[in-house]
């Protein structure tokens, strides 16, 4: 059960980011839409992927030093094998938002959501053939 906004802390520490990333990927690995992309197509090595994403989000949200990694290159590789579709990006954002909202609320939490939309938009735009117009929930009438 999600705590009320008034009782949820904001994302503030590396431990918070760790917990968020782990909670998010726990959902991803069992998700009907995303699990096949991560496990069958990308063959994700979770032992390296999780720490890399923790570093990435700590850099973005907390200003901690760290590498940005090759976000676009890895997504291009996956897209070449099995094209990513708007529903992949919609689901990714929905799970990310839900993972945040389950435990955190505040300016940094909102920044994490906004940044995820920007990342998704940039990646989808640069992949070609993936006309993602942002999360379905934010589009008027759910139109693409």
Language-model segments: which ranges?
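Core of compact, soluble alpha-helical bundle domains
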Residues: 1-144
């Amino acid at each position: 059960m999600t705590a009320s906004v008034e009782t949820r802390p904001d994302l503030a520490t590396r431990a918070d980011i760790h917990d968020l990333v782990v909670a998010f990927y726990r959902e991803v690995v069992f998700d009907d839409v995303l699990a096949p992309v991560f496990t069958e197509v990308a063959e994700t090595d979770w032992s390296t992927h999780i720490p890399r994403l923790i570093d990435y989000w700590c850099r973005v949200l907390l200003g901690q030093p760290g590498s940005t990694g090759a976000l676009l290159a890895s997504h291009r590789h996956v897209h070449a094998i099995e094209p990513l579709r708007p529903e992949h990006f919609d689901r990714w954002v929905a799970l990310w938002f839900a993972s945040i909202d389950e435990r955190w609320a505040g300016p940094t939490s909102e920044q994490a959501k906004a940044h995820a939309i920007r990342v998704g938009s940039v990646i989808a735009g640069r992949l070609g053939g993936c006309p993602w117009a942002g999360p379905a929930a934010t589009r008027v009438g759910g139109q693409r």
